[in-house]
Amino acid sequence: MSRELFAPLVRACRTVDHTYVFHRKGSVWGFVKLIREIRQTQFDWVLDLQGLFRSGVLCLCSRAKNKAGRSDAREGARWFYPLKANLPQKGSEAHALEILMEFKRLFDKQPDGLKPLTFDTTLSESNRKPLCDPPLKRLMIFPESRRTEKEWPFFQELTGMLLQQSPNLQLVWVGTSPIQPTFHAAPHVQSNRFVNLSGSTGIEELPALIGSADLVLANDSGPMHLAAAMEKEVVALFGPTNPNQYGPWGQFHNVLTAPDGDLAKLTTEQVGKTLMQKL
């Protein structure tokens, strides 16, 4: 089950056989149709990993031998399924992925041993072409996040600085909205050292883009978690959110945390130094 926004990415994941699409802002009739679609299949297990009212209703209405959800479910969802995955020993302070891995115990498995996610995705010709020229090292930059206070404000300054200081580095911007460079980008675009793909990629292209990079730089965001899930090295910039709960899984050593939770206090020089050490 996936929101329409993420469905193309979920479909591309090699571990997924079928995707049901949930329209978050859809009508009540659309929700009823989704329930009918789900009920056409008899499942062995249905797991509610989100733990909210609507996901709980979908779990309740499904035809499954076993139905399970989160013990910390909200909005009354915990009453919709007979089986529950307990919180890990750290409780609600555990990492979000640690909480979800507790579902493995329902299948007599230990909550560890995750394998990297793999995808069947390709890039469009227009996006693939500027990424074909070796032998430059490639830094993939995702400047956006879901909330403004989680966005580091110095990506423009950092990009300009790295282009000046690192002639053997290609920098690629990726984002949902078009971002115009404020630095003098023309010569770097002509030499293919700066590639601006912001506003021109589909979500299903993200795995191919991330896979082509030597290093990823991102805020606390979906692309950061995707890079970590693919086991691609990612430098993650954290402000108000707690990296112990939401940091890149398996790469907590690559987290740069802003003083006082204020990303404006994380300097360009600090981030640039960390990147160059890893490149």
Identify the meaning behind each predicted range.
Residues M1-L279:
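Catalytic machinery of carbohydrate-active enzymes
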